[in-house]
Amino acid sequence: MTLQLLCKKVLMSFPALGAFLFPVLLSGQYAFDGPISAITSGYGSFGNDSVIHEFFTVNPDSLYECDDTVRGIISYPYGANAALPVLLSFPGGSYVDFSDSNYFKSQEFYQSFVASNGYVAATAQYNSGPGSDEGCAYLWTTELMKNRSNLVDSTRMGMRGYSLGAGIANWLSLTMFNDRNWGSNGRFVWPDAGASFIGWHDDWPNDIYRQTDSGLAAMPDDVLYLMTMHDLDNTADPRTGIDIYNFMGVPDSNKEFYVIKGDTINNYIYWATHFTQSTYARDSTQFTTFITKHDALDYWFGTRMLHAVMETAWNNDPLARRICLGNGDSLQTTYANGQLRGPIVTDTPWMTMFESWNSGGGYMNPCEVTWNMRQYVTADACFTLNLPEVDDYDDFTIYPNPAAVDQKITIDADIEVERILVYNELGRLIMEPKIEAFTIDRPGLYVLDIQFETGTNHRGTFIVQ
């Protein structure tokens, strides 16, 4: 595959954005590793459009808590003559003032992918420190919608954030989708490997309502919401993602939680870590090797899911929906025709689905870090596996407990039961009984999640022996 990429270097020809041109022809720009081939056709493949990249700048603005000159990239199809759907991407929080060329290298893969398929992609780095992350994201996206309305269709929008950027994507989408109705003709949010919720720093008291359970519930129902976290990620505590996912107010049919799993094939390791989505940056914190190689996971986890959610949100494509929101459809869980281990896909995520949690090694950014503002507005933000036994609850009983293998287990509740979920001790959902009686064919410790019509739910352990 050869793409023609025309790069524009931005100066300040009007208040926020401007450009001068220099053409560059890049061929085979992505070194590829591993035994499984890249996707070259269908969902996840690069498109046929030639691509233009512009570097833009936005001046600091203390009103928006942005103390840095924002430097970013906007990419779009060559010859675009109408406003196109846009993907806004928010990077992790390295707080390194990268040169434009180095930041471009880290973002080129996904920027080019989106634009080659006929859409617009925009991203910008954070520069000096954490005081500017959310404010600068708010500022540059606002300026982009205002100054490039001839190119960017603010009614068709996706937000994708990685690590710290995942928290910004959660906050900014909730803010802009509600306050400005961005994405009203098709919208999605994809937080990856990330922080729970990053909003205003200085103005947090006036923004706190967005971070409450009811604030998260205000996400518009038509938003498509994908959350991805990674099996061996020792940076992001999965509880932060699970908490946000559980309270994010879109129907189950429009949201999905993924646990991305790695694999080893012919001695090549496909790492599923905090850095799975990177095709350039080096991981020097968790392993002694470069684990961010450009390989098949960048397509089956990365471009294929992104392609599918764009086509679902912006073109109402039913086949694409099965790939990104398939509720466990084989199109969603099968990678590379079964050659590569697929993800866990669930609406009821749990920490023990992650090897990083089961290993007991802890996290660089545990749920209890001071900047996880959710823990200040809800007591359940950093829940643990210290579950009570089912017998500790007064408003329902389960009997017999312990039960024998294949013995009928009955739930008797004072309140109408809406849903019953049963997990094994690894945190995997093993059944969803449709009536208040069921059997289990293996001994072990199990978790019962019982949800009532009143909106409350209880989790507790019981034994089959």
What function would you assign to each model-found segment?
Residues 29-82:
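N-terminal cap/lid segment of alpha/beta-hydrolase-fold proteins
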Residues 100-122:
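Short amphipathic alpha-helix adjacent to the substrate-entry channel of hydrolases
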Residues 242-385:
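C-terminal catalytic-base region of ester-bond hydrolases, centering on the histidine
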Residues 102-104, 122-140:
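Catalytic nucleophile-loop/oxyanion-hole region of alpha/beta-hydrolase
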Residues 183-266:
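The feature captures the conserved acid-bearing segment of alpha/beta-hydrolase catalytic domains
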Residues 83-93:
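Short beta-strand element of the alpha/beta-hydrolase
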Residues 82, 139-167, 175-180:
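Gly/Ser-rich "nucleophile elbow"/oxyanion-hole loop immediately N-terminal to the catalytic nucleophile
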Residues 3-5, 13, 25, 391-399, ...:
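C-terminal outer-membrane/trafficking sorting elements
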